[in-house]
């Protein structure tokens, strides 16, 4: 647990509540003090959904601290069962309320004696894991609970469907373009002649979970959420899984070939090579674009990539392998899974950055001065400050990255969206000069605050005025070189004279 100005992955209870609110007719109750209960507001603001967020906060206040939580938590569970009639109620503490060290499992047992709904306590260590790890574990816990329940009741469907079928695991609320990706994956499966058995947790009910073993295989499109569930189903039912993210032309083809191998091992006798060839040549514009003059203009340009494991690794490979862009460094904030990330991006970038500190990321961007950034909402802010364009490719994200229109990142339509994102993220040709001539920049003033909080330099008004006269496409570089020169010389205030001295010294 730490106090942070910005977090890439939220605390564990956010992951648990993302899973609970993704299912249909499941209610989440968080045992939390005021301040930890922002999930409802965040989801209501960001997700383009008509329904209210099915989450209730059982507030830890002074009365609870004096008397204990049992009465309040149990009453809230029973009240929500009566009001909402959910199939399942998931109780989760937050990292703050976990400090109380209360026996919440006992509260759940007490409440379940008086409820029609099943009641589960999220089996998550709130001190040790983040949002993504908690979401992965909570999904596995719910699946395991209902598989075991169906097995006891004799309603578990274990016989495979007559034709090839798939479970798509890991599509959640507040996921990066998850709903668009899900639609694209369903279309891809239909094109391959594969029936979608279940999509979980998004839009599924807990009663559907007993049908999970009927699918021929599981597809886990995201590294972060769904892996534990797929491993559980493989252990219990020998159900194979495909864990290749179909993002970009090469990886989409690799994913389809892996699916082909899984199906043929079960006697399906399918061959998808003609489909891959046709999609790559005629449907996806990415392969054609990568050979066009527009893409050749990007060859050798420098870029940096930062995000979760899934999107940062896939984007690094697309930029380097499919578009010839030089990835100076690629990074992830998923420190718990760093070895997988290093192996994935090996050979596709010069350096690897593993951190969840946004100031380290910002300083790394400023150090290499790339032509474009591909990252999260935070890297977008960094890009604004450094006058470097940024394409957002991973959560955490703000409202503009929950588009109403169709914007998948996976599959063959996803490759087209990625081409547009990459191409439009670079400042091209005369664009910057035209913006200088005709206006259109967000601001004419140079933001002179450093990226790190401990910036020790100030610019005089005359120095800033002189800096503003420099064309925009090199202004950022001149500014950084001047500040570097000033630090080396022990100068704390940058004047016009310092600017010119730096220019002579470093050729800025």
From Swiss-Prot:
| Details of cofactor binding | Binds 1 [4Fe-4S] cluster per heterodimer. The cluster is bound at the heterodimer interface by residues from both subunits.
Name the enzyme group at the top EC level.
Answer: oxidoreductase
Task: Quote the pathway field.
Answer: Porphyrin-containing compound metabolism; chlorophyll biosynthesis (light-independent)
Q: What is its EC number?
A: 1.3.7.7
**Which CDD domains does the entry mention?**
Pchlide_reductase_B
Catalytic activity, reaction form: chlorophyllide a + oxidized 2[4Fe-4S]-[ferredoxin] + 2 ADP + 2 phosphate = protochlorophyllide a + reduced 2[4Fe-4S]-[ferredoxin] + 2 ATP + 2 H2O
> Per UniProt, which keywords does this protein have?
4Fe-4S, ATP-binding, Chlorophyll biosynthesis, Iron, Iron-sulfur, Metal-binding, Nucleotide-binding, Oxidoreductase, Photosynthesis
Q: Which positions are annotated as binding substrate?
A: 429-430
- Which protein, by its recorded name, is this? Light-independent protochlorophyllide reductase subunit B
């Amino acid at each position: 647990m730490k106090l942070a100005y910005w977090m890439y992955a939220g605390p564990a209870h956010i992951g648990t509540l993302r899973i609970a609110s993704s299912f249909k007719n499941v209610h989440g109750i968080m045992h939390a003090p005021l301040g930890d209960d922002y999930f409802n507001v965040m989801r209501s603001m960001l997700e383009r959904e008509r329904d209210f967020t099915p989450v209730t906060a059982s507030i830890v206040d002074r009365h609870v601290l004096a008397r204990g939580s049992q009465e309040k938590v149990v009453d809230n569970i029973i009240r929500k069962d009566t009001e909402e009639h959910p199939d399942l109620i998931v109780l989760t503490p937050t990292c703050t309320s976990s400090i109380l060290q209360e026996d919440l499992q006992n509260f759940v047992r007490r409440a379940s004696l008086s409820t029609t709904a099943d009641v589960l306590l999220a089996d998550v260590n709130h001190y040790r894991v983040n949002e993504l790890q908690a979401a992965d574990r909570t999904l596995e816990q719910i699946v395991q609970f209902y598989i075991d329940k169906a097995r006891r009741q004799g309603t578990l469907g274990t016989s495979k469907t007559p034709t090839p079928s798939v479970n798509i695991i890991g599509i959640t609320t507040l996921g990066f373009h998850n709903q668009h990706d899900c639609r694209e994956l369903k279309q891809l499966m239909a094109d391959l002649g594969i029936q979608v058995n279940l999509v979980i947790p998004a839009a599924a009910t807990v009663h559907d979970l007993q049908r999970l073993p009927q699918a021929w295989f599981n597809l886990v499109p995201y590294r972060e959420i769904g892996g534990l569930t797929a491993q559980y189903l493989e252990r219990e039912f020998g159900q194979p899984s495909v864990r290749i993210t179909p993002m970009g032309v090469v990886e989409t083809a690799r994913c389809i070939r892996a699916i082909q191998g899984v199906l043929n091992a079960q006697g399906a006798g399918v061959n998808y090579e003609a489909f891959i060839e046709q999609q790559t040549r005629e449907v996806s514009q990415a392969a054609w674009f990568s050979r066009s003059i527009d893409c050749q203009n990007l060859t050798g340009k420098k870029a940096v990539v930062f995000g979760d494991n899934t999107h940062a690794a896939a984007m690094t490979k697309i930029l380097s392998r499919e578009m010839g862009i030089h990835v100076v460094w690629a990074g992830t904030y998923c420190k718990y899974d760093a070895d997988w990330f290093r192996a994935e991006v090996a050979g596709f970038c010069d350096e690897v950055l593993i951190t969840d500190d946004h100031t380290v990321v910002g300083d790394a961007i400023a150090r290499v001065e790339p032509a474009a950034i591909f990252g999260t909402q935070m890297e977008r802010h960094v890009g604004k400050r450094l006058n470097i364009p940024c394409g957002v490719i991973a959560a955490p994200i703000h409202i503009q990255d929950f588009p109403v229109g169709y914007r998948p990142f996976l599959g063959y339509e996803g490759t087209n969206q990625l081409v547009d994102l990459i191409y439009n993220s670079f400042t091209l040709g005369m664009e910057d000069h035209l913006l200088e001539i005709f206006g259109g920049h967000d601001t004419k003033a140079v933001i002179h605050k450093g990226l790190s909080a401990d910036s020790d330099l100030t610019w005089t008004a005359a120095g800033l005025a002189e800096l503003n006269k420099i064309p925009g496409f090199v202004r950022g570089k001149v500014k950084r070189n001047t500040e570097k020169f000033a630090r080396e010389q022990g100068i704390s205030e940058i004047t016009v004279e310092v600017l010119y001295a730096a220019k002579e010294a470093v050729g800025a």
